[in-house]
Structure formats: C-alpha cells, structure tokens
Amino acid sequence: MAKIQLNGKEVVIKSNYSILDLLKKYKLANKKVAIEHNGIIINKTNYRKKYLKDNDKIEIVHFIGGG
C-alpha cells in the first residue's frame, strides 16, 4: 500500500499502481484529462508506464464542455 496526495487529499492505493490504474479507479480513463505527477505534466502515452509510490503528489484536471 502507498499513501499519495490526490488533488490535495490523502488517498491510499495498492502497490504497483499506475496513473492509468488511478484513472480507471475514478472512471476517468476515457475522459480528457491533464495529469501532474510531482510537479511534472505527464504525457498520456506514459500513463500506463508511470507507477505511483508513497508520498507522490498527483493533480488530475478533467475537462467539461460548456458554453
């Protein structure tokens, strides 16, 4: 298990959890999102490869259409 900060809130996740796993957990995997991992914007092609560890800070911004 690992504790991360997700959008400013502490969350406990399983070990070997990728950014893609996190997006799936919150039903955001098929949404348009921007991910910041420890202050660095992560390219969508790396969501599956980037694994989270204890004390990581993740910010997820998802886009909502409107007018």
Task: Please describe what each predicted stretch is.
Residues 18-27:
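Short amphipathic, charge-patterned alpha-helical segments
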Residues 55-58:
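Loop/turn positions that initiate beta-strands
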Residues 42-47:
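Short alpha-helix capping/helix-loop boundary micro-motifs
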Residues 1-9:
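Eukaryote-biased recognition of intrinsically disordered, low-complexity regulatory segments
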Residues 37-38:
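Cytosolic Rossmann-like ligand/nucleotide-binding regulatory domains
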